[in-house]
Amino acid sequence: MTLLTSSLLLFSLLTSRLEAIPVLEKSPAHPAHSAHTAHPAHPSPGVRILRAPESLVAPLGDEVVLECETSLQPERFEWSHRSSRSPGAGFKYLRTGTAKANVSQEAAISRLRVLVRPDTLGEYRCVGWFGPLVVTSTTARLELASTSLVDAQEPESPLQWRVSAGNSVLWSCGQQVQSNPSASWSYFRNGVEIKPEFIGTNGNLFLSNVSSESSGSYSCQATNPASGERIQLPGSLQLQVTPEQRSQSKSPHLLKGQPSSQEITIREGSSLLLLCPGVGSPPPTVVWSSPDVVGAVKNKRSKVFGHALEISNTRVHDAGTYICFQDNGVRPALEHYIKVHVEQPPQIVRPPWADLTNEGDRLKLECEATGVPTPEIYWLLNGHSSIDDTEAELSNNFLILHSVLKRHAGYVQCFARNRLGEHSAGTLLQVNPKQIQEPRESGGTHRPNPNQGSKHKQMYPPTPPNVTRLTDESVMLRWMVPRNDGLPIVIFKVQYRMVGKRKNWQTTNDNIPYGKPKWNSELGKSFTASVTDLKPEHTYRFRILAVYSNNDNKESNTSAKFYLQPGAALDPMPVPELLEIEEYSETAVVLHWSLASDADEHLITGYYAYYRPSSSAGEYFKATIEGAHARSFKIAPLETATMYEFKLQSFSAVSASEFSALKQGRTQRPKTSTTEEPTLQMGDRDTTTPSHNETFNMSPMLTGTIGGGAVLILLLISTCLCVCRRRNSRSRGNNPNKPRMAELRDDFVPLGNCSPTKQRQRTRHIHITLNPLAQQQQQALEEKNDTDQDAPYYQRPSSYDYDPALRRMSSSSLRRSQRTLERAGGSNGSNNGNNNNLNQTAEAGAVENPGKPGRVLMKRPRLSSRSENLSSGSLNSVGV
């Protein structure tokens, strides 16, 4: 792949970003990092090197295989090489299929076959391409196997040692051999190979508690395990063991050729064997100690075998000086010093941490590593060395970018290396590009016209979406609208296209509202949306279409290529556990969660939070939480005093975890004002809402008292209503079921029987509404009555037994009533029966009492509380 193509792929990520949606804010209570706490790799792209190529030592002409494995299958693998002939030169990408290098790929594993030649020796790297991201492995060295003598001199005369029985003898045979890799040793006595008592002595032959049978001629041989080459060392040892009783007493001392001190270098984690030279007569007793290492001898990892001290699983703090003290009772005693160096491979303890950075800003990244010797730190920006970047400066463990440019967007890796190996860590650098303002026409000062409104405002497009796999058929998109003063956006539409020839863009049906026209951060406003009904094992591109207030639209740049992998091919993501939903305020809650102790945070880019009211069965609102280290977040705004249900899932650039268990929480209730309320005027009402404690914390006794009082008041009101109704019924008559005609007749009383005390009530008349069906006929009759006042009518002579004035008034009232009855009888034949019955009743009363004067009926006063309406019946008037 050419550099031009690589640059085009990188450009697609320049404006990509991972931000939270508007409803999210960082929790105010966030634990601070201690000075020794390592930052997690954030934001992580979700991909990493699982198995880097290992350094190899091989003979000339051999073929070796370097393997590299990534956590996810990349779009492609590439290998780079730096020759050992020019160590100062940079790495160069290899051409595959050549005679000296052949690359093959199987899923997420790449293999490089190399023929060992002088020009193929050197360092190799594996490079994985994930869209615009470039992830580089640590360096593997390919070295040539070799074995040689340090000083090729003429053979020396054999060593002649004479010791008494019971002593321990140490012979350093392999001090003159240099081998890569380390040689394996064979020892011979009188030409016969013997098995050494201790293995891994690096060319030292140790014989403990020698006897006369140990006497003889000793020699050694070095073998290169890679090439199989063997070297017979020229030196030899002639050992003579004498009986102890024949030897004279001698203080502990060293034999000819034995070192007075030793210096040993070992790799951390290996087993360390310290051997103490020296003999005496009688054989001395050995005591081990160390002035530098506390508890170096007396611990679970240390074992003492007389003249030998073995320390397993060596650690860095085991380095120091060890003393072998020998004493046999004959002065002086012997002290032998051994200096131990423990080397440690590099390990990055504080990886770089890059947040969203504006284009043109200054960025400082730190990378702290441990190791012995002290590791060297170097940086790669999307696979390219920072040394070649004009904006980059290296200062101790820091990488300083004086001005962040678009080409810096991508994966930034820190490497720590020493002679034992390399270690790397990386972070995703996101660059927020500058918004390019369209130049205004020159020629005078431009003054804004308030009447123009938003006519000349610019349409700023959203950033390209970041894509995360949700399921085998769906993805989550995240994008941002940078802060600007352009035309407001109304809605968004999501478009996607399958990569391939003749594949068209498709638009989803959902309209994604812009929401409130305000920025949720200094950088702008973020959004999320999901796309479903995709096909696994296919590559897609996505873009966002923004619709503005002028009904015009503008598209974002397309996303990087996204390969939708099936879930079976992905490692499961850590599932967060919701611990608590904190009632933060009336419109906000804070989510608290945790991860399992064995969860790998390096796989996590952030978290998705889903929430909705518990009473709703609709879709969940979505929120994005950035950073694998986040353990709490505030969600706002929410409805007051409303119960919500929440669930979480972690995500990376290529996949998302399973959902956490649902957990419910609610926002706080409105707080009751503690100030004194003003006096309520007429028509006002108290609308103060009781607080949560006032509503639910009343004592049971108070509750029972209030309830009992309310019941008594209801009973009292019911009793009063019943008594009033009964009195009202009695005042209307004892027979509530008597006919309406009889009731109407009772409304008129005989004038002769009327007592003087009721004269004041005679002016109160009943108002009778005519039948609506006969209103027109009644109106015509009334007009006829007005024109014919002398119409004849029949009336029995009446006698009055009281005041003449009252007699004249009653007579006039009766004449009007009789004329009304006669007109009704003439106009509505259906009512004659009722009128006749009424007249007949009056006449029958006169016949039955012939001796009494005729009765004249007058209207009886009615209570004002009763209203008579006879319009629904057939009676239209009253008969006398």
Swiss-Prot record:
Residues 665-678 have a biased composition (Polar residues). SMART domains: FN3, IG, IGc2. Residues 45-142, 155-232, 252-340, 346-432 form the Ig-like C2-type domain. One of its GO terms (molecular function) is coreceptor activity. Disulfide bonds join C68-C126, C173-C220, C276-C324, C367-C414. Changing I713T: In strain: Ky-a. Belongs to the immunoglobulin superfamily. IHOG family. This is Interference hedgehog. It comes from Drosophila simulans. The gene is iHog.
